[in-house]
From Swiss-Prot:
NCBIfam families: argG, PRK00509.1. This is Argininosuccinate synthase. GO terms for molecular function: argininosuccinate synthase activity; ATP binding. PROSITE patterns: ARGININOSUCCIN_SYN_1, ARGININOSUCCIN_SYN_2. The keyword Nucleotide-binding applies. It is found in: Cytoplasm. The gene is argG. Homotetramer.
Length: 407
């Protein structure tokens, strides 16, 4: 499994560690592959759940790591990555709210910070050679720490299956709770959980009930709708049901409420950055509610050209986040444009949750451009319907000239 002659040049490496099968095998592999190399395990707490972190340090040390750093990034993740991204309206290929993609830059940044702290000369990740994450992580590393060597075991070692990894660990008496019969590959954080693999690899298969773990099936959700009120300031959710909450706590509260109503499920076949298609089932209950609330307030406050520009920013931002280009001048530019528009995105919105749907049913804003008196068909003092005639003649001038030239 490892080279007979060990590689040199790496003395200390920081590994993005989850405690799963892959990264548990990476620790001994690094020690066997690199001469006199110290392994520092790093885990980012981005809201994947306490159960994922219990015993993690002990497991890393038992696998051969010299130390394990668990860094709490939950609040920063929601405040500085999720909130700015959803303010742009970014949604990949019309359906995906970018849960995995948004988490990668903050994890990579924290990994680099740990590497600087411990004096490491290399970074390591457990991403496969077929997925998007290898590009996302290494793109961030290139922007933040181009001097550090990057090690990607899945592109180097001979192991190709879960069975290979299990056999590798067993041969070294390293304990793992993983089994060869794992069905799905899952990735969770505060924003969402993703599910891939198993029967989902055939797009003709409907996802079984065992796929979903965060939300109830819409058909099993309560028969009575629930209403949740959001207050929004500058494109950020500040209150849930009139309660002031931090970004992370607001998201957690909405996750709890919306998941009971089956809100936030999608089943998509997406275009990966590396060129292939993949099928994924995603659950984003609280995020779906937040997204609906922001768009509802935008309908009130953004004029036609501003709305068009916001949609263009959203499309660019969706691809940028998905493709792992967070630490770039383009990202800074798009976020600045979004922040300018978000100055007016203030107000209150009520979202109706019912059997998988999150619908904005009430909305108001101090910056609203909607006026009931202007929009009615009755007489008003601001809009004289006679003025429309001149506007229409100018608006259709090009069509009129074109028709005249063709005669």
């Amino acid at each position: 499994m490892s080279s007979t002659v060990k590689k040199t040049g790496v003395k200390k490496v920081v590994l993005a560690y989850s405690g799963g099968l892959d990264t548990s095998a990476i620790i001994p592999w690094l020690k066997e592959t690199y001469d006199d190399c110290e392994i520092v395990a790093f885990c980012a707490d981005v809201g994947q759940g306490e159960e994922e972190l219990v015993g993690l340090t002990e497991k890393a040390l038992a696998s051969g790591a010299s130390e394990c750093h668990i860094v709490d990034l939950k609040e920063e993740f929601v405040k500085d990555y999720i909130y700015p991204t959803i303010a742009t309206g970014a949604i990949y290929e019309g359906t995906y709210l970018l849960g995995t993609s948004m988490a990668r830059p903050i994890i990579a940044k924290a990994q680099v910070e740990v590497a600087r702290k411990v004096g490491a000369d290399a970074l390591c990740h457990g991403c496969t050679g077929k997925g998007n994450d290898q590009v996302r992580f290494e793109g961030c590393f290139a922007a933040l720490a181009p001097d550090l060597k990057v090690i990607a075991p899945w592109r180097e070692w001979e192991m190709r299956s879960r069975e290979d990894l299990l056999a590798y660990l067993a041969a070294r008496d390293i304990q793992t709770s993983a089994s060869a019969t794992k069905i799905y590959s899952r990735d969770a954080n505060a924003w969402h959980i993703s599910h891939e693999g198993g029967e989902l690899e055939d797009p003709w298969n409907e996802p079984s009930k065992g796929v979903w773990t965060l939300t109830v099936a819409p058909e099993d959700a309560p028969d009575e709708a629930e209403y949740v009120a959001l207050s929004i300031k500058h494109g950020r959710v500040t209150h849930v049901n009139e309660q002031v909450l931090s970004p992370y706590n607001a998201l957690m509260k909405l996750n709890d409420i919306a998941s009971k109503h089956g809100v936030g499920r999608i089943d998509i076949t997406e275009n990966r950055l590396v060129g292939m298609k993949s099928r994924g089932c995603y659950e984003t209950p609280g995020g779906t509610v937040m997204f609906a609330g922001l768009r509802a307030i935008e309908e009130l406050v953004l004029d036609k050209t501003s709305r068009t520009w916001r949609e263009q920013v959203a499309a660019q931002m969706a691809h940028l986040v998905y493709d792992g280009r967070w630490f770039t001048p383009l990202c800074n530019s798009l976020l600045a444009a979004s922040e300018s528009l978000a100055e007016a995105v203030n107000g209150d919105v009520v979202i109706k949750l019912y059997k998988g749907q999150a619908t904005a049913v009430k909305k108001r804003s101090p910056n609203s451009l909607y006026s009931e008196s202007f929009a009615t068909f009755g007489e008003d003092d601001v809009y004289d319907q006679k003025h429309a005639e001149g506007f229409i003649r100018l608006y259709s001038l090009a069509s009129r000239i074109r028709a005249m030239n063709s005669n």
